[in-house]
């Protein structure tokens, strides 16, 4: 078994909506990013890549490459997952923590879990997504952006 950890953060800027966990969430602000700015899927992709020792999302999909401008993070997650499976890994489980003062994530979490399970080809019982605030402390608490942490457990397939 191998464990990976991922982290991502994006500042608010421009107009909404925002995309988190593949879900389009109405909000008056957008997130500044080269791709679609999906902090949840970016952190999750990093966790999975880290567990498989395949680097990180920036190495695989660099923000200096115009091909990834406005990229759909679900596509990036699926491509990373294909590479991980090619190394002989299966999924144990993933756990994602979204850190945001606003907008509220709770109503959107069930659909986030559905999308992640679809993209990883796993059961929803293998996917947990939760959200928290920082009690108005720090940049997320001041409403300057959104952060996310994720962990992933991979299992080497039997030979």
Swiss-Prot record:
The keyword Lyase applies. Its cofactor is a divalent metal cation. GO terms for molecular function: 2-C-methyl-D-erythritol 2,4-cyclodiphosphate synthase activity; metal ion binding. It catalyses: 4-CDP-2-C-methyl-D-erythritol 2-phosphate = 2-C-methyl-D-erythritol 2,4-cyclic diphosphate + CMP. It comes from the Bacteria. The record marks 34, 133 as: Transition state stabilizer. Binds 1 divalent metal cation per subunit. InterPro entries: MECDP_synthase, MECDP_synthase_CS, MECDP_synthase_sf. The keyword Cell division does not apply. 4-CDP-2-C-methyl-D-erythritol 2-phosphate binds at residues 8-10, 34-35, 56-58, 61-65, 100-106, 132-135, 139, 142. Pathway: Isoprenoid biosynthesis; isopentenyl diphosphate biosynthesis via DXP pathway; isopentenyl diphosphate from 1-deoxy-D-xylulose 5-phosphate: step 4/6. It holds the Pfam family YgbB. Its EC number is 4.6.1.12. Keywords: Isoprene biosynthesis, Lyase, Metal-binding. A divalent metal cation binds at residues 8, 10, 42. SUPFAM superfamilies: IpsF-like. One of its GO terms (biological process) is terpenoid biosynthetic process. Belongs to the IspF family. Involved in the biosynthesis of isopentenyl diphosphate (IPP) and dimethylallyl diphosphate (DMAPP), two major building blocks of isoprenoid compounds. Catalyzes the conversion of 4-diphosphocytidyl-2-C-methyl-D-erythritol 2-phosphate (CDP-ME2P) to 2-C-methyl-D-erythritol 2,4-cyclodiphosphate (ME-CPP) with a corresponding release of cytidine 5-monophosphate (CMP). Homotrimer. HAMAP family: IspF. This is 2-C-methyl-D-erythritol 2,4-cyclodiphosphate synthase. It comes from Citrobacter koseri (strain ATCC BAA-895 / CDC 4225-83 / SGSC4696).
């Amino acid at each position: 078994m191998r464990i990976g950890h991922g982290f991502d953060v994006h500042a608010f800027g421009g107009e909404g909506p925002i995309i988190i966990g593949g879900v389009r969430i109405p909000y008056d602000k957008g997130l500044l990013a080269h791709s679609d700015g999906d902090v949840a899927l970016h952190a999750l992709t990093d966790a999975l890549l880290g567990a498989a020792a395949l680097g990180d999302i920036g190495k695989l999909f660099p923000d200096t490459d115009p091909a990834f401008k406005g990229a759909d993070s679900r596509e990036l997650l699926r491509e990373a997952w294909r590479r991980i499976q090619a190394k002989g890994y299966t999924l144990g489980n993933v756990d994602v923590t979204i850190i945001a003062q606003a907008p509220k994530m709770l109503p959107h979490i069930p659909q986030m879990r559905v999308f992640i399970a679809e993209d990883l080809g796993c059961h929803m019982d293998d996917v947990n997504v939760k959200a928290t605030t920082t009690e108005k402390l720090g940049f997320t608490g001041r409403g300057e952006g959104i952060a996310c942490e994720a962990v992933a457990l991979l299992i080497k397939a039997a030979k």
